[in-house]
């Protein structure tokens, strides 16, 4: 399932990229700035991170602190290394833990700060988990080029991409919004440099921030970390930074994205039973009635849908919000089933799913607590406020182990039900003001750190206890997708903006830049080809009222059979054949390619007002000298075309407006005659 590289050129490229990372981590490094004319002092960087301690920059402290280091091969293609610096005067220990992955030009790391002394440390502040100065500009007016992607505000612009030339004197800033990591900006971005395309991912499910500053035509300084840090550490206390992942590809910039997706799928995407799953088919019943079917759900109608979906071979069915006492939204904090809707609890529904070879699950929102609910009444000391009087929305403090244990026990009770193995977590509030309100002046950032660390511990425990389970992350849609959530949740709802075909095409185009499509989910409520293909590039959520009289079961079966036949292609390389667009006058086209299998797929869309009947595209990643067998779903036609022709000019036509096509291709094995 991995992108395979040819020997020769590919190996030389990987070697050159690996050399770049070796230079980066040869502490202290200079990134060859001295070789450039007029290299300004402010562009120098000694380490790929920075912080200020007791008013002094880390670049001046670390070179004189005692150090220790080590490395380890974890097996499975993962190698780790670490280096630690300790201040002999105060006992502050800074530990840099890094890892890389066989066959990929990458390096990720986390910083840890620990007080090994007997007194509080001086103030540690302005921690930049990434502080990197590049000195290899592109040619032309723009010395560097940034590919940035918007977050998910739950509107048509969700994950909208932009390419920004970084000119001298310009600073571009990216950040989370309100404490949810992909609320404002997506924490994956790419910089085109003269040395190659550098993809940067930030793993922090809270308030991260990044800045890219080009002080002159030669240099680009990139920083990223938790947005606000200014704190002392008590004796024995230890905290961590966001995780930083760097990925460098020399060559075509879109090939960088194709390779990066493979890295994520193999080494970062959350596992199920020790394996990275293919895209998953499941039903969230709330989407069968427009996404708002919540408090109306009950045991009877949920079992009815389970029985109706059974012939379609879904892997799971879940009930969304509203199943608990108090209902949606005011019942968040009551985690017992509503007696009027589920008089025997959730056991009969889970048992019905198990009887039809599905697993069952529920929506939870453990972090948001409505004032007056059971959680608040029993544990008022476990919640955070933002300081406003009359607070009705509270935040469960996941920095407390008691809170983590409490919710684990709740989930454990449901997981004990036969057939129950799906956990969906939502988060419908911005936590940032709650975190910061609870920080002392000399502890700014600590509440957020403890909260995020606790959340990760809770998620890790869920995964370790039920390795056969499925877990889905939602935060008012796709507002908390980052490198750390990907490692813990196999599924992520991409948006709370639903059922718009052109928007689905566009947002999936954007997410495909960095993520294998198994990781994101999209609901499908219609049975036509155009809608099906618009949402196909995801873990698909069929959201039909399958128990309605007259439901076209055979049509639904045909669509899902087609999905199962091609979903393995969604975890391979991805290439944009046409630019991102939501315009009614444009076309959209993308390619999914599995070089290890010699096959792939093209999704093609003509929007409703496009005046053009034909479009020309050029495929990528094929073998120029080989022939490929193409199959067109609309007509059933097959063609035999040379790879060189497909990669230079491939004309495609659609008469319908809107219209779509799904084309699969497979490399033809050549017969050798003796």
Task: Explain the meaning of each model-derived region.
Residues 2-213, 227, 627-640:
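Polysaccharide-binding surfaces and accessory modules of carbohydrate-active proteins
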Residues 16, 455-638, 653-655, 660-663:
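Active-site-proximal substrate-binding groove within the catalytic cores of carbohydrate-active enzymes
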Residues 231-250, 658-666:
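Short Pro-Gly-centered flexible turn/kink motifs
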Residues 278-282, 290-298, 339, 365-413, ...:
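Active-site-adjacent "subsite" loops/lids of carbohydrate-active enzymes
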Residues 281-284, 317-319, 360-364, 423-425, ...:
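Hydrophobic faces of well-ordered beta-strands that scaffold small-molecule active sites
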Residues 288-377, 405-406, 450-458:
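Aromatic- and glycine-enriched glycan-recognition loops and surfaces
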Residues 329-340, 368-388, 438, 442, ...:
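Aromatic- and acidic-residue-enriched segments that line the glycan-binding/catalytic groove
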Residues 641-674:
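C-terminal beta-strand-rich structural cap/linker in extracellular carbohydrate-active enzymes
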């Amino acid at each position: 399932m991995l992108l395979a590289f040819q020997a020769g050129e590919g190996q030389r490229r990987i070697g050159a990229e690996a050399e770049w990372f070796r230079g980066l981590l040869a502490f202290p490094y200079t990134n060859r700035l001295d070789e450039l004319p007029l290299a300004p002092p402010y562009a120098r960087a000694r380490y790929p991170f920075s912080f200020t301690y007791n008013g002094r920059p880390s670049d001046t402290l670390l070179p004189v602190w005692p150090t220790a280091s080590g490395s380890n091969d974890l097996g499975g293609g993962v190698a780790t290394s670490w280096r630690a610096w300790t201040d002999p005067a105060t006992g502050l220990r800074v530990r840099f833990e890094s890892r890389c992955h066989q066959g990929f030009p990458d390096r990720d790391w986390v910083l840890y700060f620990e007080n090994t002394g007997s007194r509080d440390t001086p103030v540690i502040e302005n921690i930049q988990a990434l502080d990197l100065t590049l000195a290899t500009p592109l040619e032309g007016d723009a010395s560097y080029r940034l590919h940035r992607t918007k977050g998910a505000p739950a509107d048509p612009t969700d994950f909208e991409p932009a390419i920004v030339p970084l000119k001298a004197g310009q600073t571009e800033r990216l950040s989370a919004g309100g404490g949810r990591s992909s609320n404002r900006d997506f924490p994956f971005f790419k910089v085109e440099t003269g040395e190659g395309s550098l993809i940067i991912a930030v793993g922090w499910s809270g308030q991260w921030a990044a800045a890219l500053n080009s002080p002159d035509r030669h240099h680009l300084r990139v920083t990223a970390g938790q947005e606000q840090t200014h704190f002392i550490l008590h004796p024995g206390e230890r905290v961590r930074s966001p995780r930083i992942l760097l990925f460098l590809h020399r060559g075509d910039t879109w090939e960088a994205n194709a390779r990066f997706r493979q890295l994520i799928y193999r080494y970062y995407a959350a596992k199920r039973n020790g394996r990275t799953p293919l895209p998953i088919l499941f039903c969230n019943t709330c989407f069968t009635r427009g996404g708002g079917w919540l408090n109306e759900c009950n045991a009877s109608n949920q079992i009815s849908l389970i029985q109706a979906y059974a012939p379609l071979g879904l892997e799971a069915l879940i009930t969304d919000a509203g199943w608990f006492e108090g209902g949606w939204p005011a019942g968040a904090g009551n985690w017992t089933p509503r007696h009027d809707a589920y008089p025997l609890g959730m056991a009969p529904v889970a048992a019905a799913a198990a009887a039809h070879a599905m697993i069952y699950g529920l929506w939870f929102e453990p972090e948001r607590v409505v004032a007056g609910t059971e959680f608040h009444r029993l544990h008022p000391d476990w919640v955070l406020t933002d300081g406003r009087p009359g607070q009705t929305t509270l935040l469960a403090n996941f920095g407390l182990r008691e809170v983590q244990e409490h919710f684990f026990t709740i989930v454990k009770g449901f997981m004990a039900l036969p057939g129950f193995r799906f956990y969906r977590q939502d988060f419908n509030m911005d936590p940032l003001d709650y975190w910061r309100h609870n920080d002392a002046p000399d502890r700014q950032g600590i509440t957020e750190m403890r909260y995020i660390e606790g959340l990760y511990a809770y998620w890790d425990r869920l995964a370790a206890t039920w390795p056969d389970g499925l877990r889905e992350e939602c935060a008012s849609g796709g507002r908390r997708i980052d490198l750390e959530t990907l490692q813990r949740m196999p599924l992520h709802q991409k948006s709370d903006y639903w059922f718009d075909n052109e928007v689905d095409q566009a947002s999936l185009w954007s997410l495909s830049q960095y993520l294998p499509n198994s990781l994101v989910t999209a609901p499908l409520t219609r049975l036509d080809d155009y809608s099906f293909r618009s949402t196909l590039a995801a873990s698909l959520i069929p959201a039909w009222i399958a128990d309605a009289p007259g439901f076209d079961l055979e049509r639904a079966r045909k669509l899902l059979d087609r999905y199962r036949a091609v979903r393995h292609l969604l975890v391979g390389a991805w290439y944009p054949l046409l630019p991102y667009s939501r315009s009614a006058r444009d076309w959209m086209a993308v390619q999914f390619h599995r070089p290890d299998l010699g096959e792939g797929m093209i999704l093609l869309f003509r929007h409703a007002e496009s005046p053009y009947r034909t479009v020309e595209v050029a495929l990528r990643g094929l073998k120029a000298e080989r022939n490929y067998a193409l199959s067109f779903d609309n007509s059933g036609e097959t063609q035999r075309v040379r790879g060189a022709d497909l990669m230079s000019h491939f004309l495609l036509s659609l008469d319908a407006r809107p219209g779509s096509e799904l084309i699969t291709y497979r490399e033809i094995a050549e017969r050798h005659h003796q």
